[in-house]
A protein has these predicted regions:
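Conserved ABC ATPase signature
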Residues: 93, 134-141
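Conserved ABC ATPase "signature" region
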Residues: 101, 105, 112-130
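Hydrophobic anchor residue at the start of the ABC signature
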Residues: 148
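Conserved catalytic motifs of ABC-family nucleotide-binding domains
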Residues: 155
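Catalytic Walker B motif of ABC-type/P-loop ATPase nucleotide-binding domains
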Residues: 159-163
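ABC ATPase "signature
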Residues: 217-218
Length: 244
Protein backbone atom coordinates (compact mmCIF):
# COMPACT_ATOMS: atom_id res chain seq x y z
CA UNK A 1 0.00 0.00 0.00
CA UNK A 2 1.16 3.52 -0.79
CA UNK A 3 2.21 5.11 2.52
CA UNK A 4 1.84 8.70 1.32
CA UNK A 5 -0.67 10.39 3.61
CA UNK A 6 -3.48 12.18 1.81
CA UNK A 7 -5.63 12.73 4.92
CA UNK A 8 -4.13 13.41 8.34
CA UNK A 9 -6.42 13.92 11.32
CA UNK A 10 -5.29 14.83 14.83
CA UNK A 11 -7.58 15.13 17.87
CA UNK A 12 -10.56 16.29 15.79
CA UNK A 13 -13.52 17.18 17.99
CA UNK A 14 -17.03 18.47 17.37
CA UNK A 15 -19.32 19.71 20.11
CA UNK A 16 -22.93 20.86 19.94
CA UNK A 17 -23.48 22.79 23.19
CA UNK A 18 -22.85 20.18 25.92
CA UNK A 19 -22.98 17.18 23.54
CA UNK A 20 -19.74 15.92 22.00
CA UNK A 21 -20.56 14.24 18.69
CA UNK A 22 -16.95 13.53 17.68
CA UNK A 23 -14.45 12.91 20.48
CA UNK A 24 -10.83 13.78 19.68
CA UNK A 25 -10.35 11.33 16.81
CA UNK A 26 -6.97 10.81 15.12
CA UNK A 27 -6.14 8.78 12.01
CA UNK A 28 -4.38 8.87 8.64
CA UNK A 29 -5.58 7.83 5.19
CA UNK A 30 -3.10 6.85 2.51
CA UNK A 31 -3.14 7.78 -1.14
CA UNK A 32 -5.08 5.34 -3.31
CA UNK A 33 -6.64 3.28 -0.54
CA UNK A 34 -10.28 2.49 0.14
CA UNK A 35 -10.77 3.66 3.71
CA UNK A 36 -13.94 2.56 5.46
CA UNK A 37 -15.34 4.84 8.14
CA UNK A 38 -17.73 2.50 9.92
CA UNK A 39 -20.18 2.75 12.77
CA UNK A 40 -23.83 2.51 13.68
CA UNK A 41 -26.23 5.30 12.79
CA UNK A 42 -25.55 8.21 15.13
CA UNK A 43 -21.95 7.19 15.84
CA UNK A 44 -20.57 10.47 14.47
CA UNK A 45 -19.42 9.35 11.02
CA UNK A 46 -21.24 11.97 8.98
CA UNK A 47 -20.35 14.74 11.43
CA UNK A 48 -16.67 13.83 11.15
CA UNK A 49 -16.84 13.69 7.37
CA UNK A 50 -18.46 17.12 7.18
CA UNK A 51 -15.51 18.56 9.09
CA UNK A 52 -13.06 16.91 6.70
CA UNK A 53 -14.73 18.30 3.58
CA UNK A 54 -14.99 21.81 4.98
CA UNK A 55 -18.74 22.22 5.43
CA UNK A 56 -18.66 22.05 9.23
CA UNK A 57 -16.11 23.72 11.49
CA UNK A 58 -14.32 21.60 14.09
CA UNK A 59 -14.54 22.64 17.72
CA UNK A 60 -10.89 21.67 18.14
CA UNK A 61 -8.19 19.54 16.56
CA UNK A 62 -6.54 19.57 13.15
CA UNK A 63 -7.01 17.94 9.76
CA UNK A 64 -5.14 18.06 6.47
CA UNK A 65 -6.98 16.87 3.35
CA UNK A 66 -5.00 16.58 0.11
CA UNK A 67 -2.31 18.64 1.83
CA UNK A 68 -4.63 21.52 2.75
CA UNK A 69 -5.71 22.60 6.23
CA UNK A 70 -9.49 22.25 6.49
CA UNK A 71 -9.65 25.26 8.82
CA UNK A 72 -7.60 27.77 6.84
CA UNK A 73 -7.77 26.49 3.25
CA UNK A 74 -11.32 25.24 2.88
CA UNK A 75 -11.73 26.24 -0.76
CA UNK A 76 -8.64 24.29 -1.86
CA UNK A 77 -9.93 21.27 0.04
CA UNK A 78 -13.25 21.49 -1.80
CA UNK A 79 -11.50 21.74 -5.18
CA UNK A 80 -9.42 18.65 -4.43
CA UNK A 81 -12.25 16.33 -3.46
CA UNK A 82 -15.43 14.80 -4.74
CA UNK A 83 -18.39 14.35 -2.40
CA UNK A 84 -21.49 12.21 -2.55
CA UNK A 85 -23.91 13.01 0.26
CA UNK A 86 -26.07 10.56 2.15
CA UNK A 87 -29.16 11.92 0.42
CA UNK A 88 -29.40 11.94 -3.36
CA UNK A 89 -27.63 15.11 -4.49
CA UNK A 90 -28.81 15.47 -8.08
CA UNK A 91 -31.77 17.63 -9.09
CA UNK A 92 -34.84 15.51 -9.86
CA UNK A 93 -36.44 18.23 -11.99
CA UNK A 94 -33.42 18.50 -14.31
CA UNK A 95 -32.48 16.02 -17.02
CA UNK A 96 -29.43 13.81 -16.71
CA UNK A 97 -27.58 16.02 -19.20
CA UNK A 98 -28.59 19.20 -17.38
CA UNK A 99 -27.38 17.82 -14.06
CA UNK A 100 -23.99 16.90 -15.49
CA UNK A 101 -23.67 20.33 -17.11
CA UNK A 102 -24.64 22.07 -13.87
CA UNK A 103 -22.21 20.20 -11.65
CA UNK A 104 -19.48 20.35 -14.26
CA UNK A 105 -19.81 24.13 -14.14
CA UNK A 106 -19.59 24.14 -10.36
CA UNK A 107 -16.38 22.13 -10.61
CA UNK A 108 -14.95 24.71 -13.01
CA UNK A 109 -14.88 22.55 -16.12
CA UNK A 110 -14.95 24.16 -19.56
CA UNK A 111 -17.83 23.60 -21.99
CA UNK A 112 -15.71 21.24 -24.07
CA UNK A 113 -14.67 19.27 -20.99
CA UNK A 114 -18.28 18.99 -19.86
CA UNK A 115 -19.36 17.81 -23.30
CA UNK A 116 -16.61 15.17 -23.45
CA UNK A 117 -17.25 13.95 -19.92
CA UNK A 118 -21.01 13.80 -20.49
CA UNK A 119 -20.55 11.49 -23.48
CA UNK A 120 -18.15 9.27 -21.55
CA UNK A 121 -20.21 9.19 -18.36
CA UNK A 122 -23.51 8.18 -19.97
CA UNK A 123 -21.70 5.56 -22.06
CA UNK A 124 -20.02 4.05 -19.00
CA UNK A 125 -23.35 3.89 -17.16
CA UNK A 126 -25.29 2.73 -20.20
CA UNK A 127 -27.69 5.67 -19.94
CA UNK A 128 -27.46 7.02 -23.49
CA UNK A 129 -31.21 6.59 -23.98
CA UNK A 130 -32.07 8.52 -20.82
CA UNK A 131 -29.75 11.51 -21.21
CA UNK A 132 -32.69 13.86 -21.87
CA UNK A 133 -35.00 12.37 -19.25
CA UNK A 134 -35.60 13.87 -15.82
CA UNK A 135 -33.31 12.36 -13.22
CA UNK A 136 -36.30 12.00 -10.90
CA UNK A 137 -37.59 9.22 -13.15
CA UNK A 138 -34.53 7.02 -12.54
CA UNK A 139 -34.58 4.14 -10.01
CA UNK A 140 -32.68 4.83 -6.77
CA UNK A 141 -29.82 2.52 -7.70
CA UNK A 142 -29.16 4.40 -10.91
CA UNK A 143 -29.40 7.72 -9.10
CA UNK A 144 -26.69 6.57 -6.70
CA UNK A 145 -24.43 5.44 -9.54
CA UNK A 146 -24.99 8.76 -11.30
CA UNK A 147 -24.19 10.74 -8.14
CA UNK A 148 -20.92 8.85 -7.76
CA UNK A 149 -19.94 9.43 -11.37
CA UNK A 150 -20.76 13.14 -11.18
CA UNK A 151 -18.67 13.47 -8.00
CA UNK A 152 -15.71 12.30 -10.12
CA UNK A 153 -16.25 14.71 -13.03
CA UNK A 154 -13.32 16.94 -12.08
CA UNK A 155 -11.00 13.98 -11.37
CA UNK A 156 -10.51 14.67 -7.65
CA UNK A 157 -7.67 13.20 -5.59
CA UNK A 158 -10.14 11.99 -2.97
CA UNK A 159 -13.82 11.15 -3.12
CA UNK A 160 -15.92 11.14 0.05
CA UNK A 161 -18.95 8.85 0.00
CA UNK A 162 -21.49 9.16 2.81
CA UNK A 163 -23.59 5.99 3.12
CA UNK A 164 -23.58 5.57 -0.69
CA UNK A 165 -25.43 2.25 -0.73
CA UNK A 166 -28.15 3.07 1.77
CA UNK A 167 -31.57 1.89 0.68
CA UNK A 168 -30.47 0.02 -2.45
CA UNK A 169 -30.79 -3.71 -3.13
CA UNK A 170 -27.87 -6.16 -2.67
CA UNK A 171 -27.19 -6.45 -6.41
CA UNK A 172 -26.94 -2.68 -6.82
CA UNK A 173 -24.71 -2.51 -3.74
CA UNK A 174 -22.31 -4.97 -5.33
CA UNK A 175 -22.34 -3.07 -8.63
CA UNK A 176 -21.65 0.17 -6.78
CA UNK A 177 -18.64 -1.36 -5.07
CA UNK A 178 -17.34 -2.51 -8.44
CA UNK A 179 -17.41 1.15 -9.48
CA UNK A 180 -15.52 2.08 -6.31
CA UNK A 181 -12.85 -0.53 -7.02
CA UNK A 182 -12.45 0.69 -10.59
CA UNK A 183 -11.88 4.26 -9.40
CA UNK A 184 -9.48 3.20 -6.65
CA UNK A 185 -7.46 1.27 -9.24
CA UNK A 186 -6.91 4.60 -11.03
CA UNK A 187 -5.25 5.96 -7.89
CA UNK A 188 -8.18 7.86 -6.42
CA UNK A 189 -8.50 7.69 -2.64
CA UNK A 190 -11.93 6.52 -1.48
CA UNK A 191 -13.25 7.58 1.94
CA UNK A 192 -16.54 5.83 2.55
CA UNK A 193 -18.90 5.83 5.53
CA UNK A 194 -21.31 2.97 6.02
CA UNK A 195 -23.25 1.18 8.73
CA UNK A 196 -23.25 -2.04 6.67
CA UNK A 197 -20.52 -4.00 8.43
CA UNK A 198 -20.22 -6.52 5.60
CA UNK A 199 -19.01 -3.67 3.35
CA UNK A 200 -15.94 -3.36 5.57
CA UNK A 201 -14.63 -6.46 3.84
CA UNK A 202 -14.29 -4.44 0.63
CA UNK A 203 -12.01 -1.82 2.23
CA UNK A 204 -8.23 -1.79 2.53
CA UNK A 205 -8.50 -0.50 6.09
CA UNK A 206 -11.40 0.45 8.31
CA UNK A 207 -11.99 2.53 11.40
CA UNK A 208 -14.94 1.75 13.63
CA UNK A 209 -16.65 4.57 15.50
CA UNK A 210 -18.69 3.96 18.62
CA UNK A 211 -20.42 6.90 20.30
CA UNK A 212 -18.15 9.51 18.71
CA UNK A 213 -14.82 7.76 19.30
CA UNK A 214 -12.70 5.56 17.05
CA UNK A 215 -12.53 2.24 18.88
CA UNK A 216 -10.56 0.30 16.26
CA UNK A 217 -8.55 0.91 13.09
CA UNK A 218 -6.84 -1.75 10.97
CA UNK A 219 -7.39 -4.05 8.01
CA UNK A 220 -10.53 -6.21 8.16
CA UNK A 221 -8.34 -9.32 8.30
CA UNK A 222 -6.33 -8.05 11.26
CA UNK A 223 -9.40 -6.89 13.16
CA UNK A 224 -11.12 -10.26 12.80
CA UNK A 225 -7.96 -12.00 13.97
CA UNK A 226 -7.54 -9.62 16.92
CA UNK A 227 -11.06 -10.23 18.19
CA UNK A 228 -11.08 -13.91 17.15
CA UNK A 229 -14.26 -13.67 15.08
CA UNK A 230 -15.30 -14.48 11.52
CA UNK A 231 -17.05 -11.29 10.42
CA UNK A 232 -16.76 -7.53 10.77
CA UNK A 233 -20.26 -7.45 12.23
CA UNK A 234 -18.98 -9.56 15.13
CA UNK A 235 -16.02 -7.18 15.53
CA UNK A 236 -18.42 -4.26 15.78
CA UNK A 237 -20.64 -6.02 18.31
CA UNK A 238 -17.66 -6.77 20.55
CA UNK A 239 -16.49 -3.17 20.39
CA UNK A 240 -19.97 -1.81 21.11
CA UNK A 241 -20.37 -4.10 24.11
CA UNK A 242 -16.97 -3.08 25.47
CA UNK A 243 -18.03 0.57 25.38
CA UNK A 244 -21.25 -0.24 27.21
Amino acid sequence: MNKEKIIAVQNLTKQFCSFTAVKSISFDVYKGEIFGFLGANGAGKTTAMKMLIGISKATSGDALVAGFDVKTNTEMVKRSIGYMSQKFSMYDDLTLKENITFFGGIYGLSRNQIKEKTVRLVAELGLEDTIDKLVGSLPLGWKQKLSFSVALLHEPKIVFLDEPTGGVDPITRRQFWEMIYAEANKGTTIFVTTHYMDEAEYCDRVSIMVEGSIEALDTPKNLKAKYNVNSMNEVFLKLARNVE
